[in-house]
Amino acid sequence: MNIETLRKTAKQMVADGKGIIAADESSGTCEKRFTTVGVPCTEENRRIYRQTIITAPDFEKYLSGIILYDETIRQEDDNGERFADILTKKGILPGIKVDAGAKDLALHPDEKVTEGLDGLRERLAEYKTFGAMFAKWRAVITIGNNMPSDACIHANAHAMARYAALCQEADIVPIVEPECLIDGDHSIEKSYEVTVKALRKTFEELEGQDVVFEGVVLKASMVIAGKKAPKQSSPQEVAEMTLKALKETVPADLAGVVFLSGGQGDEQATENLDAMNKLGGVPWPLSFSYARAIQNPVLKLWAENPSANVGKAQSALIFRSKMNSLAAQGKYSSEMEKERPY
């Protein structure tokens, strides 16, 4: 483990208001998203769509990294150049999703545990040869009646810590993502309670595995009321409750925090990130690692005509990335949305 390499990479991931695009959807998730826009989910269509994202001009102004899927990190553009090499030339860090997905947690109905530790050391070594500089592992925590259980939080935190240790051993920065789902009708107070519990256990387990916090990036859920809650959360409430949860649980020497959008609306995710950065008062950079909240308009425009709409789709990608980059600096205003090219 080279601590300086890890620190340098982690710092680059959260520098200068830049964020990370999550383009690591599994083939199954891609199938769902492509079906909604009427595009067959073939391997070639997935390659062309990801090529549209990866070759967007000048998006390195707003992005520090892209999380790729196993299939994608092995793919090439139309000219035979590997996607990871294109990103590296742009100054964008290639990352890789390494978990094997959330599986049913034994004896705990409706709860999940993330698998994928078997063979991970060897997979990380291979991904490093492809140019991967960081990795991602996502745990899924459901908020509901008597959920999450202590067993669910512990099992996921322990697996995530072992993953993080293996990453650092390979000089790959781990993104740890304990996602508290926003499905359901829970209040923002319940979201806060669960988020604090999940984060506290995650960092306890990371410390137990001797993981170096300066070489870790947290991908955090925002503290927000469930989608079906009668009272929805304002950006100010989300900012106050989220920063309160982070201050209570996250070590000051962590490299940085990037937020997942978790099914929020595109502008909602941007507004909430901006509110947090305007509030400030935390020791870490606060940025974004969005999938749908950036890709929604991109996929829609591309799907209308995959060969002719590449430029339009890329303009949407650049615009949403720019809006979120401004939000990561507390410089966003909803008035700016009037300039959007879609």
For every predicted segment, state its role.
Residues 100, 141, 180, 222-224:
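Short, histidine-centered active-site or binding-site loop motifs used for metal coordination
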